[in-house]
């Protein structure tokens, strides 16, 4: 009954998505600074997630959370999600000159689909997309930024990126 609560709004999401991770970092900074100012411990519940990124602990956000969690008397709790039964992730290894096919189930009524493919920086991989009707796009060119393709009635927007200085994947 005597607990003090600090609530931080991350910002108003744009119509394209959720608040940016930089807003999450700013919010964490604010909470820890307030905890130091009031000389009180801070327990932070982060119920903010997405399926983007390599999830290997090397992103700028992941490293920031690691660092800021060591300041003062803080406990940062992050939910791990409940998408395991949804088969939203896959991983694997393959050898040189080995072709690997990863099938993705898409419903007829599904208006869009976001797929991310992550690899180690030093690995050289050719990636192609094959539609259910057999239209093949690729191998994808290593052109940084957005690329557009059409496969039948389907428009494909592909964004090609590279690792940041904070991540090898």
Where are these regions (language model features)?
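Loop-rich non-cytosolic ectodomains and luminal regions
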Residues: 1-169
């Amino acid at each position: 009954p005597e607990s003090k609560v600090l609530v931080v709004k991350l910002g108003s999401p744009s119509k394209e998505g959720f608040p940016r991770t930089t807003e999450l970092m700013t919010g964490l900074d604010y909470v820890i600074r307030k905890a130091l100012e009031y000389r009180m411990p801070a327990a932070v519940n982060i119920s903010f997630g997405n399926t983007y990124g390599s999830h290997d602990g090397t992103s700028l956000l992941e490293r920031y959370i690691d660092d800021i969690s060591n300041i003062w008397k803080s406990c940062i709790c992050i939910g791990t999600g409940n998408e395991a039964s949804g088969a939203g992730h896959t991983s694997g290894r393959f050898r040189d000159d080995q072709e690997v096919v990863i099938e993705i189930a898409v419903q007829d009524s599904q208006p869009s689909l976001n797929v991310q493919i992550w690899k180690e920086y030093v690995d050289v991989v050719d990636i192609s997309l094959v539609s259910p009707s057999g239209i093949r796009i690729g191998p994808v060119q290593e052109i940084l930024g957005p690329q557009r393709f059409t496969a039948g009635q389907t428009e494909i927007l592909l964004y090609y990126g590279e690792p940041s200085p904070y991540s090898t994947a």
